[in-house]
Amino acid sequence: ARPGCGKSSFVGNVAINMAREGYPAVIFSMEMDKEEWADRFVSQDSEIESDLLQTGKLTHARQWEAVSESVSRLADLPLYIDDSPYLTVTAVRAKVKRLLARTGSLAMVGIDYLGLMEDIGSNSGNLAFSIGKVTRALKQLARECQVPIALLCQLNRGVESRNNKRPTSADLRDSGRIEEDSDVIITLY
């Protein structure tokens, strides 16, 4: 999806719904920090607008009670947010393995998003090659650990100039390897 189309919201909703069912999930987020994710989840769970939470302008006792109950519910969920700003595939692999050892299983790994991974662009300017190495390594990690990985990525700008704005897998930014290494591609628009 293009920026602002809800990629982070989508992966967050999938992860929190899995966690609510008792299935451990992790999101590696290079775009938002833990506090932003917590605010998003509390807002959704308590049905209180995010801007009211951020400013602390809750005017009714019931709102404070809803936030408190929400925080208590969410604190016990098997949902892990890693907001390390500079992640490599090697770091993701190590952290996933540690979480697996600690929890026994993971229902999902979300990565927000491919273009921000440190491995991208580190191979002498060949972006497609870098992306291919990352997607191949993540595919191997998914198979090795038997865990689905939701890897968020952006679309090329060309989709905006077309009459039909419905994206296809050919619109994935910078590499056909994303399509080759994916089991499923979901596009948001």
Which ranges hold each PLM region?
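Conserved nucleotide-binding/hydrolysis micro-motifs of P-loop NTPases
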Residues: 32-35, 85-88, 114-117, 149, ...
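The conserved Walker
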Residues: 3
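Conserved lysine of the Walker
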Residues: 7
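Helical hairpin unit composed of two closely spaced alpha helices linked by a short loop
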Residues: 98, 106-151
